[in-house]
Structure formats: C-alpha cells, structure tokens
C-alpha cells in the first residue's frame, strides 16, 4: 500500500469524516481519480488535461502522491519531505539493422554489437550536476538538519544517514538514462538482422532538449529513435496557500515537525496539470502524509513484493489531510 493507493485512502477518509461532521470547506475541493499513472498518464491525467480541461476550471493547487513521509533527525524531531518538482520523462526505443548470418562467421555489420555499444555509451555517460533550486534547498536544509557536508560529486554518499532517500535525492541532481529492455535474435548461432533497446530517460526541469541531443550524439550513426512516451517536468513554487496548509497540518499533528521540499526523480499524475490547453497550469505538490517508526524502510518497499505501512501511519495521514481540507 504505497503511493497513489494511500493518497486515495487518506483523501476518502478525510472527506468521509468531514461529511459526517457536516463540515464544508471554505472553497470547492475536487477529488479526482485518474487511471494509467503507472503507465505514462497518457490515458489518465494527461488525457484529461488535454481533452477535458474544463474539469479543472477554478483549480489552482493539487495534492498528489510521493512525499509527506517522515524521516528521523538527530535532534529527535521528524522531517517531512514534500514534492514540489519532478523530472520529466522520455521513454524511447533505439533500433538498428545489420547483416544477418551465422554466428560462427566474422560479421562487421552486426546489429547486436552496434546497438550494445550505443546502449553502453549512453548508460555509462557521466551527466553533469544540474542542481534545480528545489533540490538546492532540500540539500541545504538536509545538511543543516543532519549536520552533513554535501559532496557535489557524490550526493548519495553524503546523504547516507537519510537511508533510501539518499538514492532518490542523488537521482534528482542530474539527468539520467537507464536501459530497461533489450530485444534481438532468436537462436544462439544466428546473427539477427535487427536489434532494439528501450530506455528510460529522466530530465531535470528545463534540460529536456540538451539531454535528448546528448543521447543522440552518444548513440552514434546507424541508430534509429522512436518515442514511446514523453511527459513534461513539473515545478511548483515552495510558497503559497497549499504549502502553508500542508506545513501547518503536519506540525499540528507532529509538534516540531520540519517540512522541506524535494525534487522527485520519478513521476506522478502532476505531469498532467503542467500545460493545460488554455494556457493555465496547476501547482501540484506530492504529500501523502505518513509518520513512520524509526528504522522503517519505507522507500525500499516501493513496488516491492510486500508493500506495507503501519496502520497508525495511515491514521496519521488521514488526520493531516483532514486538517489541510479544513484550510481550503
């Protein structure tokens, strides 16, 4: 029970509680469920945003998944990270052709070796540090809270006291490309005439074009590109009514809580709100509140075989969401 499922559960619990108490928010609140978030959003939030933007008329802020979970600090207080930016994505396929033949014969026009070399160049490329302002603030606050010195060349190692969040934070400091699917051939002694690879590219807001240009340069000649899916990056200001409401709600339920922003290296339904057809956009924040026991490896359970969170963490989340709705 991680991510969107918890967001739905917290929201429904808070809405039900307010309905039973006869309490109405000071302004309209829309509870919208989308399909396809784990795919690409092309048939979910993105489709709705492009085809039915009227659904979002009057909406200025949105709260979705990824964020709001607690981390212990040396002072004894808990820190809660809230997503206020996320990387964009480009899922793409690389294809190449060559000369088919027998595996026992030298073949200088081997599609598999050409593709493998291209994939290796892209996967091993050292992407430059592109620290987004949101990530800069997160790292500065983290260094203060955990008494750390941040090594810009190895952010993940610097943030080791934060556990699995260190990997997430480090991945949010650069563009990244990860090979995920390889397909070629059908028999060990037959050189195939074609080979394909699928890769997952994630870019820091504002750096999409340079990332794609670098990928194509690294691939070299003889490689054809095909886009599988693309989504924009997302940014929301770390200020305003939504941020204030989230902060006050967390601190009301956890005295002394520290709330800080972070850039999500993955994606959420927030990508569907960034570029609405009428020129509007909706500031989207990731906050599924969870007060977790110290030592609970929450992030390592994402998409695992035993996704779970403590019941009292869910109850805490429902109370926080209820308070946020009360300030709406």
Label each PLM-derived region with a short phrase.
Residues 15-40:
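Short helix-loop-beta-strand segments that form the rim/entrance of peptidase-like active sites
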Residues 32-41, 65-70, 100, 291:
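Acidic, glycine-rich active-site loops and adjacent beta-strand->loop/helix elements
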Residues 50-68:
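A glycine-rich helix N-cap at a beta->alpha junction
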Residues 66-68, 78-93, 290-303:
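Flexible glycine/proline-rich, aromatic-decorated loop/lid segments
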């Amino acid at each position: 029970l991680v991510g969107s499922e918890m967001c739905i559960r917290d929201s429904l619990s808070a809405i039900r509680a307010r309905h039973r108490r006869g309490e109405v928010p000071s302004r309209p609140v829309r509870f919208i469920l989308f399909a396809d978030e784990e795919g690409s959003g092309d048939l979910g939030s993105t489709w709705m945003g492009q085809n039915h933007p009227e659904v979002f008329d009057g909406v200025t802020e949105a709260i979705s998944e990824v964020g709001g979970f607690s981390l212990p600090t040396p002072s004894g207080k808990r820190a809660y990270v809230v997503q206020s930016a996320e990387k964009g994505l480009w899922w793409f396929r690389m294809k190449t052709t060559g000369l088919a033949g027998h595996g026992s014969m030298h073949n200088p026009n081997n599609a598999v070796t050409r593709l493998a070399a291209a994939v290796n160049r892209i996967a091993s490329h050292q992407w430059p540090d592109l620290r987004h302002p949101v990530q800069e603030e997160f790292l500065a606050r983290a260094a203060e809270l955990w008494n750390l010195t941040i090594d810009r060349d190895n952010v993940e190692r610097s943030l080791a006291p934060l556990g699995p969040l260190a990997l997430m934070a480090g991945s949010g400091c650069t563009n990244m490309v990860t090979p995920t699917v390889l397909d070629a051939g059908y028999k060990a002694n037959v050189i195939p005439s074609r080979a394909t690879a699928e890769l997952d590219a994630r870019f820091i807001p504002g750096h999409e074009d340079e990332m794609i240009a670098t990928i194509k340069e690294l691939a070299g000649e003889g490689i054809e590109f095909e886009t599988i899916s693309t989504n924009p990056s997302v940014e929301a200001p770390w200020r305003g009514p939504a941020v204030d409401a989230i902060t006050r709600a967390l601190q009301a339920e956890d005295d002394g809580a520290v709330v800080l922003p972070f850039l999500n290296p993955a994606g959420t339904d927030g990508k569907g709100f960034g570029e609405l057809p009428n020129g509007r956009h909706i500031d989207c924040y990731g906050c599924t509140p969870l007060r977790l026991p110290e030592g609970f490896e929450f992030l390592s359970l994402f998409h695992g075989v035993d996704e779970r969170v403590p019941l009292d963490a869910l109850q805490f989340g429902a109370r926080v969401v209820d308070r946020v709705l009360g300030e709406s």
